Amino acid sequence: MARFCQLKNDPDLLVSHMTLLPMFHLGAFGCLFTWAWMGWAQNLGSLRSFYKDLKRMPSQDMAAVPVLVQSIHHDLMTGKQDKLGDLWALNCMSAMFDPQTLMDLHDHGMVISQLYGSTETTGGGLINFAEDAKHIGSIGKDDGHCEIKLDNGELCMRGGDVMLGYYKDPEGTAEVVDAEGWFHTGDLARVDEDGYYFLTGRKKNVIILDSGENVSPEELEGLLAKCPAVKECLVKEKGKKICAVVCCEEADQQAVRDFITETNRTLPLYKRMSAVEFSAQPLPRNAMGKLMR
């Protein structure tokens, strides 16, 4: 919040925050109390009626999930920014975000931050305010409030903000907290030479081929999303093949097939998408806006 005041050069700045996240999401629950403590308004909207809610409850800042960021990006890139009203800051959380999309939003005047955490870390974790092209897609750097490491590519955290375990569930606790107290998040990540962490996928989503090769569906989804005809996409294993599920207009299906063919030429053989399914309807998502696999 102090950063918003600094950016606007106004210590008395009043900001209305909108969240579309369900209240069982710790990010939304935390915002509810934090913004109230600051004396700022908290607007509770719905993903299904976002634009109506934004018009009815003007907001300057918002907690955003990928599907909403994509929609806002489309509005700005097609000259429909009037639909967004006073909105000028996005707190991106809950999943991976395309760096180019975030950079486009930044170039159109949006203040971008990325937050990473979970219920098991009491919402704390990493935060990124960097707005340069190299780091805008990062979830942040280690700020010293807890220990962070990568264990075979999996992001792990340990410290005072991290839970001791699940209530009356020692078996569940043992699956995610090791003997040294490290919480294994299930998120795959990499760290660059500047100490910035970048999510690369979810451990449970990794496709393990008969050859023993591992394929991150999120990596391929990021490539598919660069096709202008693709509205939404998901990559899965089907019949021992890597299959792309794409939501697009029927008239654009051949353009998508051509894009996949060209993309495959840039990939190792084991990562290539050899099947594609099309959907005219939006792909199913859960209450937090994440694709249901």
Task: Tell what function each PLM region has.
Residues 2-86:
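Conserved AMP-binding/adenylation subdomain of ANL enzymes
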Residues 19-20, 91-93, 150-151, 157-158, ...:
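Thr-Gly-centered strand-to-loop micro-motif
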Residues 38, 54, 59-64, 72-134, ...:
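Gly/Ser/Thr-rich phosphate-binding loop
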Residues 94, 117, 140, 187, ...:
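Active-site glycine-centered loops adjacent to acidic/histidine catalytic or metal-binding residues
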Residues 136-142, 179-180:
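Short Gly/Pro-enriched turn/cap motifs at secondary-structure boundaries
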Residues 141-144, 152-176, 196, 213-215:
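Conserved ATP/PPi-binding loop(s) of AMP-dependent carboxylate-activating enzymes
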Residues 159, 164-165, 188-271:
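AMP-binding/adenylate-forming catalytic core of the ANL superfamily
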Residues 278-293:
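Flexible lysine-rich "adenylation lid" loop at the C-terminal edge of ANL adenylation domains
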